[in-house]
Each structure stands twice: as C-alpha cells, then as structure tokens.
Amino acid sequence: MLFLVVSTPRPERPSDLAKTRQSFWPWIANYQARGVCRHAYARVGRGAVAVFDVEGNNALHRILNEWADIIPAHFDTYPLVDVEATKRMLAAQVAAKKK
C-alpha cells in the first residue's frame, strides 16, 4: 500500500532540535535502502514529506511512531494508488462501457 505522509513538526525552535533532527536522514535512508520509503524530501521552512510502500496500516503506524520519536510532529497521511493500477482500472472502465 502506498501512502504520502506530510509532517508538520511541533512549534519548538528548530535550533533546539537540530541535533535530534540530524538523525532523521540516516533513519529514513534505512527505509529507502529497503524500498519501504520510495521518496523523502524536506519541506521549505519546516517538515518533510515521504512516500511509503508498506504492507498495511500497522507497518505505517510503526514507522510514524518511530518518526515522531525523532521529530515530534503532526502527520497528514494520504493513501495513494500506483499509476499502473490506475491505468488498468481506467482501461477496465472503458472496456465495460463499450459492452
């Protein structure tokens, strides 16, 4: 299952958490190396976004709890559909309409 996660850190001063924040990138790199995190980007100003490919909600829940231990934040999560799956669904809809 694909999920887009948008983090909005708590309003602490960024400089107060700089040392802790440095550990985020090696942590997320571990998930990238395993193919669990497909993309990760810092947001302008504060926060980050990432696309995760996980087995289900429990796996995502575990990852977000780990993330929050590094950088306390609010997370907006959006389930995504793979492009190829979307193309197949649209083709099936077109084929069904022709019948």
Name every feature range the model reports, one short phrase each:
Residues 1-99:
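Conserved, structured core segments of small domains
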